[in-house]
Amino acid sequence: MSKRNMWMGGVTAFALTLSYAGSALAADASDLGNSLTPVGAERAGNADGTIPAWNGGDMTPTAGWKKGDPRVDPYAGDQKLFSIDASNVDQYADKLSPGQIKIIKRYAGYRMDVYPTRRSCGYSQAIYDATKANTSRAKLSDRGGILDGFGGFLFPIPENGLQAIANYRTGFNGLYTHLKVSSTISQTGGGFLLNTGIIDTYAPYYELNAREIDNRYMTKFIYKATAPAASVGGIIMTLQPYNDSNESWGYIPGLRRVKKAPTANYDTPGQDDIRTFDQTYMYNGLPDRYDWKIIGKKELYVPYNASRLRTENLDISNLIQDKFPNRDLARYELHRVWIVEGTAKAGWRNTFSKRVFFMDEDTWTPLVADLYDTKDQLWRFQENHTFMAPEMPGCVSAADFYHDLNADRYVADNLIVKSADANYSAGDVVKSDMFTPDAMRRYGLR
């Protein structure tokens, strides 16, 4: 069989196993907390028994763990079920995305180790209550901006792709967080560039009286660079409005000035040149340059329960390899995902003709994304490795990986290694008044 036929065979297998999500779309708010989980996932397991029923998530921290400690893998005793690699990828093609198939076939040694499925993700009752309330109040603008709704997932029973994307844009990653993060950018010819910094985040969207506190911005970020030397002291602040494009400012230490960055949106190239601004965090910003639709729902092998990417023994040097991250550190499980496709709108500049997100039913988080170039060829591939943080409670990213399959380069982002601080309930450190240009300048002068 030719490589082209093998590739098309994988795509065909994927398409044939796709289920239309009509039954899910026919549900209503009374099903939340019953046949559906409080955020809209199917509560029941699958017929094969390979996906268990959701039983509330793993809400208890690992014995002995305390806030500020590196993570302990609560599932370290799980035995690997099997591995997917170039020798058997076609056997599993019906439960893989086209991007997963392509990266396995492209890079010798790339594999996916599959473990028993654990539906570990859960949230607070306050988020569940707000999610149910949003079923009668949530409203989007024509651009996909948020006109009403707060405190939980906006559309637990989405009627269209735009609503599904809105669920991710408003996903819970903590009210106040303080993270010491690293990212790497692989270089042509080998090696990587390392960036480190501190990210402070405030999400007024998740305040109990969110719209009274801040009716313009739903999430606010400040990043202060600590490496490399040329970047030390530089600060970037990004504010995400409910109903407008992201707004960003930069602080330049040498000038001691704060300047607004008017173009840091959509497909503006990032520092790494192999990722656009709106690829960050899998996808961010207004979704108004794509037509979005729900393709369906299916079972997919996805990264999950990635606590091993946050243990005290993890080091950049044993995670980052030439073409892809160390496969010994990645855990995959079988989960149900929503497939949401965005097709570029005519009349707008778009780097990608199409983006396909595979969104975890229990969190609305894209765990896998396939991105296509303007000739409709698969070009970039993204993965989001998440884990459950019971102290929040909620599932958050342990690492994001962004692959350019033409350039053979990748970005590893949101890494927190060794004893680096990861505080997901940082109200004692992060304050709501930090997120202004004036406060940003004062922060830079410290």
Which residues make up each language-model segment?
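Bacterial N-terminal signal peptides that target proteins for export
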Residues: S2-V11
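Solvent-exposed N-terminal domain segments of exported/luminal and surface proteins
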Residues: A29-N246, I252
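Long, C-terminal catalytic modules of enzymes
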Residues: A420-R446
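Gly/Pro-enriched, hydrophobic low-complexity segments
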Residues: A29-G57, I84, S97, I222-P241, ...
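Extended beta-strand-rich segments in extracellular/periplasmic secretory proteins, especially
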Residues: K180-T184, L193-A229, T280-F357, L367
